[in-house]
Amino acid sequence: MRNLFKDKNGCFKHLLGYGLALEQGTTKGYHAHLMLIYNGSERCQDWYLANEVIQKWQEITQGLGYGVNNNTHEKKKQYADRGLLGIGMIHRNQPLEMQNALNVASYLTQPEKYLQRMLIKPKANKPKRTFFKGVYREHGRNYKINLPKSAGVGVWSEQDVDDLLDEPMVIEL
């Protein structure tokens, strides 16, 4: 799957970054939480993109995998009504949208989700991680951004992203 992210073809075209957390729940078993960050000036229709990613996952797993698309109009309205909308198109000049998007991203890395930790680690010669991320690389273009000083948002360095998406501590029993 990570190779598909890197290739940036099809539903991954204009992908800027991603976060992928592997978990093991008591009712769902093994599952993953995936957050994809696209260039919003190039891609839109988040519901459609999420469905395309789910179809790609079903293809990879030969029909054994499934996905849940939280980017439906109804689901996003529920989040918006509670002031929690952090998925879909995020506008950098909207502080609440930015904060909510960061809250969504931080959900992937919460080490306190103790009941969903990986109980059985995949076998390999070296320890396997349960969180993966793709990092946006600077492209050299300068954009003029007119944000109010009170917006509390701005350009993040790679270190800022690393600090936010720091890999969770893996607890082994």
PLM region descriptions:
Residues M1-L15, L22-Q24:
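Short N-terminal edge-element motif at the start of the domain
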Residues F12-H14, G25-G29, W47, N51:
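Alpha-helix initiation and capping sites
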Residues G17-S41:
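Histidine-centered divalent-metal-coordination microenvironment in nucleic-acid enzymes
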Residues G40-E42, W47-L173:
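Catalytic "initiation/cleavage/transfer" segments centered on a nucleophilic residue
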